[in-house]
Curated annotation (Swiss-Prot):
Region called Disordered, residue ranges: 1-26, 50-69
Annotated source species: Chaetomium thermophilum (strain DSM 1495 / CBS 144.50 / IMI 039719)
Localization in the cell: Nucleus, Nuclear pore complex; Nucleus membrane
Superkingdom as given in the UniProt entry: Eukaryota
CC annotations in GO: nuclear membrane; nuclear pore inner ring
UniProt-listed Gene3D superfamilies: 1.20.58.1780, Nucleoporin, helical C-terminal domain (1.20.120.1880), Nucleoporin, helical domain, central subdomain (1.25.40.440), Nucleoporin, helical domain, N-terminal subdomain (1.25.40.450)
Family in the record: Belongs to the non-repetitive/WGA-negative nucleoporin family.
Subunit structure and binding partners: Component of the nuclear pore complex (NPC). NPC constitutes the exclusive means of nucleocytoplasmic transport. NPCs allow the passive diffusion of ions and small molecules and the active, nuclear transport receptor-mediated bidirectional transport of macromolecules such as proteins, RNAs, ribonucleoparticles (RNPs), and ribosomal subunits across the nuclear envelope. Due to its 8-fold rotational symmetry, all subunits are present with 8 copies or multiples thereof. Part of a tetrameric NUP192-NUP170-NIC96-NUP53 or NUP188-NUP170-NIC96-NUP53 module.
Gene Ontology biological-process entries: mRNA transport; protein import into nucleus; protein localization to nuclear inner membrane; RNA export from nucleus; transcription-dependent tethering of RNA polymerase II gene DNA at nuclear periphery
Annotated protein name in UniProt: Nucleoporin NUP170
Record carries keyword Metal-binding: no
Membrane topology term: Peripheral membrane protein
Pfam families reported for this sequence: Nucleoporin_C, Nucleoporin_N
């Protein structure tokens, strides 16, 4: 029966979550304070590291005794080079296996690097936050929440009670995929491979969901998307099984679909089995207990009973080794149990190793260590695959940070030829890797060599280790939990280069490089997973761990580190990345920095490996990007790498001979040659031994190597060829012989070097042509070509390897047979022989004839088209054919031929074809896209890249002519006639489709510039292309008018956030923009930032809005300051011009505005506004400024009234004084206005508007300056001022209470009566407010606190004390003045008022107490 899965998608939440949150920006500060081991190791290719004599010439090389890979003398150049490639491959494949440097013993060898060092083995490249929607679900969880990672598909998951949510953590705004059909709390989730033959092929994984009652299996379809991520779909399988009494916390799966379970209640291992359909004696899904089969599985364990003698034991993890069919379990008692998966449903426990056994093994190997005692626990296991090590099986991590490497053996392994595939029977500790030293004692000598100190067995650097993960070939991640809320992540990797260059006579050591990955504060690591394919440089232990061999062939390893805040992506740095970054640091360093770095690499990794890395970097490798993502290396770094390759590559020399070898055979080629061979070998190592084709069912032919991989390899080889060609004049062995006389030995050595380098060049040429041939082969119908071959040729094609195709005569001969078959097939299908031959010449280059033949054919087709002007179908076919032919030879078309063709296309109204041809020619003339790099670099003068741009410009100018002609030919023509597009509309649409669909960025920039020159800005706004944005963004940096155009572009597409960003950046820029215009820009930016934009999170909007608001506030202050200074009569006119030039432009810092202008000019109101904008926190300074502002305002008001009185009296004003038009306000009124202005602009900020201290100041001003009833003012005007500003009644009363109680001047003696009057006035207004609204209503309506809406007993007590104060004043007055009747009456009236208010307050308090007792 056909395997089938029910195709019903799981219902769930598909929510568009907002973008991840970022840290809130800190408020800016106010003002800046005014400043008053032995010999060098040999390399595998024969060139040993040696000291560098100078930066101009490499030093002498030490003969290692290893023969440099050389070829036989009687072979042709390509075959010689191929032999060198094979020898180099063999050397790379002989890299030591893990067992050889993890032999019995212990080590603490690390070379620690800081996280920001160019030598750091890992670095964080991206961080993806957990979506806000997930946090909302997590916060809503009631019973149990859990996070996890499916790194192999790029997804994370969260279980909240009985719901499960998955999301693509690489997506900035991921969609949540939910499973909410579980009825019980989810305890564990795992993604495992499906069992073959059970589901349809679209099911790529099985999602196992364990709850407290059952275990559910869901089908998962993970399909790749164009962006490189995975699209996930869940399907119900209707497969579930009852969980039983055992807990399920750990779920693992094997590659053949078996699913094992374990939990934290016991150490039992369960297995879930499932099948396509039910059978007689088995259901579709079931569960087996492999630890206690049968009835024992349901009998309670004695350990759980009160009389149980043993401590309760449970699992801490399950781990699968598919390469050995082993399952490991780890318990809380650090016991490791090994199970062997013998058959499809059988699981047998073969080894149980407890902690005591490990301690005993350690005692046999090394002295005691405080890191490995009976209190030490094992926290994690990591299986070591059989492809990586034949002896070592497992790595265990202790909570003290020690790595224990354990081997497992069977009895058969002790016999000669014993079967090693049998289940192991014993396990033994082989090697211990201790943590790095807490204080590194490793030192580096002057020549860069490292001297190791003794074994350190006491370091607590990794204590306590909470989690640990090991990935092949030894990438180690250790989560160190020294602080309760902060994890530290230690990562290390084998130092492959040092292991590789260890001398044969020396014992191999487990050299490692380590570093600490810095995580944000508060991060707790939950899980770490490998997101790229597992590492494997070989299929067997020997050569498996050679990272250097595959650094140009495989993507660097990437790892997802899941924390409670998100997923951190950590990437492995290859040696070429480290070298490139180290050279990048030398760009701006001293002259001898390059020598120091190269010396360091040579001493550590050998000269050949170093020079190979330099060559790779010079060819564009080492950009620290993933393989295939394009070049990212800067030119300065490439130049330094080129210098290192040329200057430190060494020289060929004659070795000492015993006389049995010929002179030429005793030549030791230079490290430069060996490095070139090494780099070339590593570029082609994937395909070198691979077969070209694979034959499937029905003679279906496919490529064994993906064509994209072939293209990448070809591009890298071509870069290498171009590099050698461009620098051949300076590379010894490629350059012409020097004029100085050589000795015979030097001459022979240089000839041999030249021959070897020439052979490698010929091989590179053959590789490039061979790949082109294969690509062309698969562009054709290769199955038809295969069918046309005879049986012998068919078999030869099936057996053909790339090595044979590139370098061997039989492969070349077979290629000629295939070429003939291709031509015959095309002839049979009616194709022209010349067309086929041209394709072969273009793709392979070996059968090249002048491109003029194709050009003539294209022109012939164009001429025939002009004769068919009235036969539209034939005309279109001939025009299309001519365009196709022209595009084939676009790179060789002369400007004259191109111009003629375009003119003919225009005459035939083939506008789209004319534009397409010009675009193709422009691209072919500059295939390296150097014109774009020249434009991106700002079009520097006297640059060789300008020539490429000029050649492109010729094509673009022709496109302008075509578009001009198109518009003039169809000017005034209607777009539609009878509802159908006219010929004019069709031609215009075709032409502009070609224009807008072009991927030529340089063309788009040129086109938009032409549009602007012609005033067609509306066309730019109507184009939906990323190139428009890039173009306008560049112009916006230098032109305010174009920046406005960019804002219009954004707003017309509802991209308000980007528009706000542009406007904010413009306001902050140094462009010639007035301050008023900057205020307008910031006002618009604030408005645009307030509008919701799709894809922009609320927090991003708030951040931008906050920034624009702050800048707008500063700009308003600067504008006020500018207007005040320009109108200030104290400032000379020439100084005003300077001020206007400085302030009427870029927004200045608050420091400049305060120190240079506002403070010096005594603009105290502006000083207070600056304090507010800067979040200034000095209460003394702020209060002093208020005092100065009040005194200044009082003086100005009195002075204006004095001038008014002079004018009214007909007198003359002093010179320079402007006569007032209307009567100026009284001083207290003017002071009130100033206070109101500051209050409104600072929104009663408690720092700038401190009521507790400001209200007494204003009250004291009123008393000291007679601003009371004596001038007709309301005696209580200060209190009314603050209450009208919205200051709470309670706060005003409390401040007045403090004034009354402290009795500080001027509130002493009889003036305390005025304070009582203010208190009575404030309480009276408060009582009225409470009575008007009602206490609870007032609290609900105004949002005030309880003390504001509901009076406390303290108010009644205050009124009582106020009455006592009045009594005292009355008594004092009677004694001093004999009891004047008017004063006594005034006090008596005030006392009656106070007593009445006290009764009102008591009544309110009584009502409130009654309500409280009622509800109580």
């Amino acid at each position: 029966m056909e395997p089938m899965t029910p195709m019903r998608p799981i219902p769930g939440a598909y929510v568009n979550t907002p973008a991840p949150p970022t840290a809130n920006p800190a408020r800016r500060r106010l003002f800046t304070e005014a400043s008053s081991s032995g010999a060098a190791a040999t390399t595998q290719l024969g060139a040993a590291p040696a000291p560098l004599a100078s930066t101009m010439a490499p030093g002498p090389e030490i003969n290692s005794g290893l023969m440099t890979p050389q070829a036989r003398e009687d072979l042709p150049p390509v075959a010689k080079a191929a032999q060198v490639v094979n020898q180099t491959l063999q050397l790379d494949d002989s890299y030591p296996d893990l067992d050889s440097y993890c032999r019995p013993g212990a080590s603490s060898d690390y070379e620690m690097q800081s996280s920001d060092s160019s030598w750091a083995p890992f670095h964080v490249v991206r961080h993806h936050n957990i979506p806000d929607k997930v946090f909302e679900h997590l916060n809503a969880g009631e019973v149990f929440t859990k996070l996890g990672l499916f790194a192999e598909i790029g997804y994370a998951w969260a279980s909240i009670d009985s719901s499960l949510f998955l999301w693509d953590y690489t997506h900035p705004n991921p969609e949540l995929i939910g499973y909410e059909e579980a009825t019980h709390t989810i305890t564990a989730v795992a993604l495992v491979p499906p069992k073959p033959g059970v589901f349809v092929k679209t099911i790529t994984h099985v999602l196992v969901v364990a709850t407290t009652s059952e275990i559910i299996l869901l089908g998962v379809s993970a399909t790749p998307t164009p962006s490189g991520s995975k699209s996930l779909t869940l399907y119900s399988t209707r497969m579930s099984v009852h969980r039983g009494g055992s807990d399920v916390s750990f779920i693992v799966g094997t590659k053949d679909g078996r699913i094992f379970l374990g939990g934290e209640s016991d150490t039992d291992i369960h297995e879930i089995f499932y099948q396509q359909e039910e059978r007689w004696f088995s259901s579709r899904c079931g569960k087996i207990n492999h630890s206690h089969p049968g009835w024992s599985a349901v009998v309670p364990s004695l350990a759980g009973l009160p009389f149980g003698s043993r401590q309760q034991e449970w699992l801490r993890g399950l781990y699968v080794d598919d390469t050995r069919n082993l399952l490991y379990s780890l318990s809380n008692r650090s016991t490791i149990r090994t199970y062997h998966m013998e058959g499809p449903e059988k699981l047998t426990k073969v080894i149980e190793k407890d902690k005591t056994s490990c301690l005993r093994d350690f005692a046999h190997m090394a002295d005691s260590s405080p890191l490995f005692t009976d209190k030490t626990n094992i926290v994690a296991l990591s299986p070591i695959p059989a492809t990586e090590a034949s002896k070592l099986h497992l790595m265990a991590l202790t909570d003290t940070g020690c790595r224990l490497f354990l081997s497992a053996t069977s009895s058969a392994s002790y016999t000669m030829g014993g079967a090693t595939s049998l289940a192991p029977q014993s396990m033994q500790l082989q090697f211990v890797k201790f943590p790095p030293r807490e204080s590194p004692t490793r030192i580096r000598t002057l020549n860069g060599q490292i001297i190791d100190s003794q074994l350190d067995k006491t370091s607590r650097a990794l204590d306590p280790s909470a989690l640990g993960f090991r990935f092949s070939p030894g990438y180690f991640f250790d989560v160190v939990r020294k602080h309760p809320n902060q994890d530290m992540l230690f990562v290390s990797a084998p130092d492959t280069g040092r292991i590789k260059v260890t001398q044969p006579a020396s014992a191999l050591k487990y050299f490692e490089q380590g570093t600490w990955i810095e995580l944000e504060n508060g991060n707790r690591t939950i899980e770490i997973g490998l997101t790229t394919a597992p590492f494997a440089a070989a299929k067997q232990p020997l050569g498996f761990g050679n990272e250097l061999a595959v650094q140009f062939d495989q993507v660097p390893g990437e790892f997802a580190v899941l924390t409670n805040t998100g997923v951190h992506i950590v990437r492995r740095r290859r040696l070429v990345d480290i070298f490139a970054k180290a050279l990048g640091n030398c760009v701006s360093a001293s002259d001898d920095a390059l020598e120091r770095e190269v010396r360091k690499f040579i001493n550590q990794y050998g000269r050949v490996e170093t020079i190979a890395a330099a060559l790779a970097v010079a060819c564009g490798q080492g950009s620290d990007l993933r393989t295939g993502t394009g070049r990212g290396m800067d030119r300065n770094t490439e130049n330094l790498a080129r210098a290192a390759f040329i200057e430190y590559g060494g020289q060929p020399r004659l070795a000492e001979s015993d006389g049995k070898q010929s002179v030429s055979e005793s030549v030791r080629l230079s490290s430069r040659h060996d490095a070139l061979a090494l780099y070339l070998t590593r570029l082609v190592r994937t395909l070198w031994k691979a077969k070209v084709v694979q034959v499937g069912s029905g003679s279906d032919i496919s490529s064994t190597i993906p064509t994209s991989k072939l293209v990448t390899i070809q591009e890298n080889v071509e870069r290498l060829r171009n590099f050698l060609e461009a620098n051949k004049s300076t590379i010894q062995g490629l350059a012409p012989p020097s004029e100085r006389l050589f000795g015979r030995q030097e001459d022979i050595a240089n000839q041999k070097e030249h021959q070897a380098l020439h052979a490698l060049q010929k091989l590179m040429e053959s590789i490039s042509e061979g790949i082109s041939f294969v690509l062309m082969l698969f562009d054709e119908r290769v199955s038809d070509i295969y069918a046309r071959l005879d049986a012998v040729s068919q078999q030869q094609l099936k057996d053909l390897t790339y090595e044979q195709l590139f370098s061997q005569t039989p492969g070349k001969e077979l290629a000629k047979v295939l070429v003939k078959a291709i031509v015959n097939r095309n002839i049979a299908s009616g194709a022209n022989v010349e067309t086929v031959a041209d394709a072969l010449r273009r793709r392979c280059g070996s059968f090249c004839s002048p491109d003029d033949v194709v050009t003539f054919k294209a022109q012939e087709q164009l001429q025939r088209a002009s004769e068919q002007a009235h036969n539209s179908p034939v005309l279109r076919a001939l025009l299309a054919e001519s365009l196709r032919l022209f595009e084939q030879v676009a790179g060789s078309l002369t400007p004259a031929n191109l111009t003629t063709a375009v003119e003919q296309y225009i005459s035939l109204k083939y506008y789209a074809g004319a534009i397409q041809l010009c675009l193709t020619v422009a691209q072919q003339k500059d295939r390296g896209n150097t014109a774009l790099s020249w434009v991106n670099d700002g079009k520097p003068a006297n640059d060789s890249r300008k020539k490429a741009f000029d050649e492109r410009k010729i094509c673009y100018n022709l496109i302008h002519q075509v578009l001009d002609k198109l518009e003039s030919d169809f000017a005034g023509e209607p777009e539609l006639v009878d509802g159908r597009p006219t010929l004019a509309a069709t031609k215009r649409m075709e032409a502009y489709n070609v224009v807008n669909d072009s991927s030529d960025e340089v063309f788009h920039f040129d086109l938009y510039e032409w549009y602007i020159e012609k005033g067609w800005t509306d066309r730019i706004l109507s184009i939906d292309s990323p190139h428009v944005i890039t173009y306008l963004q560049r112009l916006a940096e230098t032109d305010f008018r174009h920046a406005e155009l960019l804002c219009r572009f954004y707003t017309t597409r509802s991209r308000f956030f980007e528009a706000a960003q542009v406007q904010t950046n413009l306001a902050k820029s140094d462009l010639n923009i007035s301050l008023k215009d900057r205020i307008i820009l910031l006002s618009r930016a604030k408005g645009n930032a307030s509008v919701n934009t799709i894809g922009i999170s609320r927090q991003q909007q708030q951040q931008l809005n906050h920034e624009a608001s702050e800048l707008l506030e500063i700009a308003h202050i600067q504008d006020d300051l500018l207007e005040r200074l320009v109108a200030d009569p104290r400032i000379p006119e020439e100084r005003k011009a300077e001020i206007e030039e400085f302030l009427d432009g870029p927004i200045r810092t608050l420091t400049d505005l305060f120190n240079d202008y506002a403070d010096q000019a005594n603009y105290y109101d502006l000083c207070l506004l600056i304090f507010h904008a800067a979040d200034f926190h000095n209460p003394r300074t702020i209060l002093d400024t208020w005092n100065n502002l009040i005194n200044q305002s009082h003086f100005e008001a009195e002075q204006r009234r004095e001038y008014w009185e002079i004018v009214q009296a007909g007198g003359d004003l002093p010179a320079g004084v402007i006569a007032p038009i209307a009567e100026p306000p009284l001083p207290y009124v003017y002071v009130s206005q100033q206070i109101q202005l500051i209050a409104h602009r600072t929104s009663l900020d408690s720092l700038i508007f401190p009521v507790n201290s400001l209200l007494p100041v204003v009250c004291a001003y009123a008393i000291n300056n007679g601003q009371d009833a004596s001038i007709g003012a309301d005696p209580c005007w200060p209190i009314q001022l603050f209450l009208n500003l919205g200051v709470p009644h309670a706060l005003v009363v409390q401040v007045l209470e403090n004034v009354l109680d402290t009795q500080e001047a001027p509130f002493t003696g009889r003036r305390r009566k005025l304070v009582v009057q203010w208190i009575a006035m404030a309480v009276d207004m408060w009582v009225r407010e409470v009575e008007r609204r009602g206490a609870m209503a007032a609290a609900a309506a105004s949002g005030a606190s309880g003390s504001e809406a509901v009076m406390g007993s303290w108010v009644s007590e205050l009124l009582g004390r106020a009455d006592q104060v009045l009594t005292q004043i009355a008594g004092t007055g009677a004694t001093l003045r004999g009891g004047a009747a008017s004063d006594a009456e005034e006090i008596a009236s005030l006392r009656r008022t106070v007593k009445g208010l006290k009764r009102s307050v008591d009544m309110l308090l009584g009502g409130e107490m009654a309500r409280m007792s009622f509800f109580r």
